Amino acid sequence: MSVTMREMLEAGVHFGHQTRFWNPKMAPFIFGHRNKIHIINLEKTLPMYLDALKYVRQLAANRGTILFVGTKRQSREILAEEAARAGMPYVDSRWLGGMLTNFKTVKISIKRLKDMEAAKEAGALESMSKKEALMFEREMEKLEKSIGGIKDMGGIPDAIFVVDVGYHKIAVTEAAKLGIPVIGVVDTNHSPEGIDYVIPGNDDSSKAVALYVRGVADAILEGRANAVQEVVEAARGGDDFVEVQEG
């Protein structure tokens, strides 16, 4: 999948925040301002975005796990959809403190959710009173909302992709503590410091968010497909050298 500058323009990637809210550390990525709004330099954004996608592709080819993080209203739905399409974990509700740094505790909640799902599947609700069944459903819904997207993650991810680094400071800090690379969309009002793969761009427009997220999901699927293709070709190539001994 290749993204063009025209597509970025159409999605409004270049629109930053109001000039009075700017972070001076984003100066290298700002083209200018119009109507008191900073304009992001897409000639900087495009190669940086493509570089991030290259990294994602390589990570996916090596069977790496990338955790998608986006809990703002305009990013929630598309982020969950695209992460699921790419077969990756995601956080689309609130980021719970310790989700990475205290993953052992999170695993207990994941086990509880999976046990509840299995119990429901087995018809456990039928033997409960109305009140018990209601309490059960409520707890399960709450767990699904907070950790449903990471229930199959298994362990600490190899990288995290964050749609709005300012809004998800805790996630970025936890990743940094554990040495997990961060791919992050950074708008003009936030700092790019501590982000391994910076994508300077609009983090509020749902169109822009959809562009970033779809691109990352596509890169993951491409990386995996390339890895499978290489295995197939290696196996085919090996056929020429197989000597069958008779008798």
UniProtKB/Swiss-Prot annotation:
PANTHER family: 30S RIBOSOMAL PROTEIN S2 PROKARYOTIC AND ORGANELLAR (PTHR12534), SMALL RIBOSOMAL SUBUNIT PROTEIN US2M (PTHR12534:SF0). The lineage of its organism: Bacteria, Pseudomonadati, Pseudomonadota, Betaproteobacteria, Burkholderiales. HAMAP family: Ribosomal_uS2_B. Pfam families: Ribosomal_S2 (PF00318). This is Small ribosomal subunit protein uS2. Belongs to the universal ribosomal protein uS2 family. NCBIfam families: rpsB_bact. It comes from Ralstonia nicotianae (strain ATCC BAA-1114 / GMI1000). GO terms for molecular function: structural constituent of ribosome. One of its GO terms (cellular component) is cytosolic small ribosomal subunit. Keywords: Ribonucleoprotein, Ribosomal protein. GO terms for biological process: translation. InterPro entries: Ribosomal_uS2 (IPR001865), Ribosomal_uS2_bac/mit/plastid (IPR005706), Ribosomal_uS2_CS (IPR018130), Ribosomal_uS2_flav_dom_sf (IPR023591). Gene3D superfamilies: Glucose-6-phosphate isomerase like protein, domain 1, Helix hairpin bin. CDD domains: RPS2.
